[in-house]
């Protein structure tokens, strides 16, 4: 048997700040091999965003194929912790350390659950990357390519992101909004403010374009998604002088969008809007993920039933929050996210309630048993 608390502690002790691995994958691989999994590891990418350590582990054969996906990397701890963020410390019923809830605790809980299953029908796999908190270029995307090439794509996937809010089990994510980042640059001609006829100020046209973008009504949301929103995140001219008309004005924005849109269509909308007010401006865009949803059905129902059995709660099915690697996995199969409470993720003194670790392992065990016993789930 595997103790989820002990395994979480060993993982926290690996300072795997993205994209560093710091031994985390070796800890995971050793635990999985000890309970009969075949483990495949490979690195992808180059500096500065890599190399990234990735792991795929599999046990069993035939269908159904159930996968658990997660990440071993963590965000930088920052300063001001009560204790060393990479020396796991128990204070009362809380285990403190970077990654406790996001998401080394969930990985440990799933491995502990898998250890209890013994011989089972079907196939269980784990898809673990060290590149979720970073650019997400060489992690789950590379793992998906690897699985496709070997015919190892799952039928269902559970992502262990910390979806719970106030109590373990109060929220499950069945979808996520898409995200697109955009950079706008308007070039003028630098000059003295007393001689505007000898210069071309790039700011007024950019301001008009931004005002028009801020006024856009993208949609009203729908049954499962809140309205899409566009946020201007930076406006900059790099001008510290009081008597100089700047040569260039720049802005950056982000759009979080629901399944009423595709990222490319929103990029085109922004380009058209900017062109109307700042014809000389250039627009660059990066779509980090499209929106997706796994409609409520058998998969979310059995997850909800397992949560109810262990916690007594009926979870809310939600699409709120930021992006996750579920956006990539949703292209393979139905995907749902469920994990620990997220109140301290990315914060100083990140901590998980120890009883929640054990309860999460119980929930994961029930989910996997149900899926493997009912191929049509």
Swiss-Prot record:
Question: What GO biological process terms are annotated to this protein in UniProt?
Answer: diaminopimelate biosynthetic process; L-arginine biosynthetic process; lysine biosynthetic process via diaminopimelate
Q: What is this protein called?
A: Succinyl-diaminopimelate desuccinylase
Q: Where is the active site?
A: 73, 132
What does the cofactor field's note say?
Binds 2 Zn(2+) or Co(2+) ions per subunit.
| Residues bound to Zn(2+) 1 | 71, 102, 161
Molecular function as annotated in GO: acetylornithine deacetylase activity; cobalt ion binding; succinyl-diaminopimelate desuccinylase activity; zinc ion binding
- Which cysteines in this chain are paired by disulphide bridges? none
**Subunit info?**
Homodimer.
Q: Detail which positions bind Zn(2+) 2.
A: 102, 133, 346
Q: Look up the EC number in the record and give it.
A: 3.5.1.18
Q: What family does the entry list?
A: Belongs to the peptidase M20A family. DapE subfamily.
Named cofactor requirement(s): Zn(2+); Co(2+)
Among InterPro entries, the record links this protein to: ArgE/DapE_CS, Bact_exopeptidase_dim_dom, DapE_proteobac, Peptidase_M20, Peptidase_M20_dimer, Peptidase_M20A
Gene that specifies this protein = dapE
